[in-house]
């Protein structure tokens, strides 16, 4: 009779475990393989995208108009043709190599422009320092005089201070009929200004004058505007200098105001610009008495501003009429 042998159950279990393990390894290997394939595809696609991007950038023209900022004006830099011309990358490189001399010229122009700009800026700074030093020197040579009697003229005031040193300029300001008038007297050197301080309290007219060091310099008058002959000096006696004129007031309004208050106006020059809120005028009368009467108008309101009137140091010269151009 044949004998039957039974296999142990634990052996069967071990075989099943081995089989399951083998299947798991196959699945893992397949997953790794699929992942590798996916990664490879992604990397390939990324490289293709990068190549496309590089190719696209190569086709861009760096001198195209859209690459320049809004404030850049190609007309001023002779770049009109270059800014509006589109070139492929290869053609652009070829053109650049062929026109290397032209690019060098542009670089030289830019370099020269930069040098000129730096030179101009340095020159302005130097000029500014010189003018500041000159202004400070002028202030040291100037004294401020107040409480000037209405009968005192600039010539009389300069005569008083001429004993202290050479007087190079004298300017009386303020209402000519008020004791609140003041003046600036500039000397040729610091010593004259220093000695002038000792004249404080000196009776000039009916009032003692006060003399102090000035904090400002006298605004110089352009020598070309000063009278050049006796006739022009006589014109100055009939001319007044009017300031603080409302910008809304016209030249006709200024003329009508002074003619109705003082007398006939023969010439009038109304001046102004965008930087100042008010304007100035030079008014020449037919008679010197009219100019004296006009000095009383200082403080009167014309338009919406009180005007300031003082004797003029310069005549109102007639405008030069140029012949029409033949071109």
Curated annotation (Swiss-Prot):
Source domain of life: Eukaryota
InterPro entries: CID8-like_RRM1, CID8-like_RRM2, Nucleotide-bd_a/b_plait_sf, PAM2_motif, RBD_domain_sf, RRM_dom
Organism: Arabidopsis thaliana
Primary location class: nucleus
The record's note on its domains: Contains a PAM2-like motif, which seems to be involved in the binding to the PABC/CTC domain of PAB proteins.
GO MF terms, alphabetically ordered: RNA binding
A GO cellular component entry from the record: nucleus
Classification of source organism: Eukaryota, Viridiplantae, Streptophyta, Embryophyta, Tracheophyta
UniProt domain RRM: residue ranges: 141-216, 238-314
Compositional bias ranges of the Basic and acidic residues kind: 97-113
Transmembrane segment boundaries: none
CDD domains: RRM1_CID8_like, RRM2_CID8_like
Designated name of the protein: Polyadenylate-binding protein-interacting protein 9
Basic residues bias: start-end ranges: 114-127
Keyword terms: Nucleus, Repeat, RNA-binding
Keyword field contains Nucleotide-binding: no
């Amino acid at each position: 009779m044949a004998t039957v042998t039974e296999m142990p159950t634990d052996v069967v279990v071990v075989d099943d475990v081995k089989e399951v393990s083998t299947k798991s390894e196959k699945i893992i290997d397949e997953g790794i393989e699929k992942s590798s394939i996916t990664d490879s595809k992604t990397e390939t696609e990324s490289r293709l995208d990068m190549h496309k991007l590089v190719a696209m950038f190569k086709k861009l023209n760096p001198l195209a108009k859209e690459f320049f900022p809004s404030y850049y004006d190609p007309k001023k830099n002779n770049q009109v043709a270059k800014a509006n011309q589109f070139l492929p990358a290869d053609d652009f490189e070829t053109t650049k190599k062929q026109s290397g001399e032209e690019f060098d010229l542009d670089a030289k122009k830019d370099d020269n422009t930069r040098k000129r700009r730096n030179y101009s800026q340095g020159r302005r700074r130097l000029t500014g320092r010189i003018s500041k030093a000159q202004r400070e020197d002028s202030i040291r040579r100037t004294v401020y005089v107040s409480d000037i009697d209405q009968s005192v003229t600039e010539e009389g005031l300069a005569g008083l201070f001429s004993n202290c040193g050479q007087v190079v300029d004298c300017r009386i300001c303020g209402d000519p009929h008020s004791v609140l008038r003041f003046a600036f007297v500039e000397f040729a050197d610091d010593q004259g200004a220093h000695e002038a301080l000792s004249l404080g309290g000196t009776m000039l007219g009916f009032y003692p004058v006060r003399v102090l060091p000035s904090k400002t310099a006298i605004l110089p008058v352009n020598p070309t505007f000063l009278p050049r002959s006796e006739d022009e000096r006589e014109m100055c006696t009939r001319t007044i200098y009017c300031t603080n004129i409302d910008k809304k007031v016209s030249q006709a309004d200024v003329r009508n105001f002074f003619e109705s208050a003082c007398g006939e106006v023969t010439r009038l020059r109304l001046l102004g610009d965008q930087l100042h809120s008010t304007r100035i005028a030079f008014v020449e009368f037919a008679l010197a008495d009219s100019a004296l009467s006009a000095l009383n108008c200082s403080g009167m309101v014309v338009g919406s501003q009180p005007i300031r009137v003082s004797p003029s140091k310069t005549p109102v010269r007639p405008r030069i009429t140029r012949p029409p151009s033949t071109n």
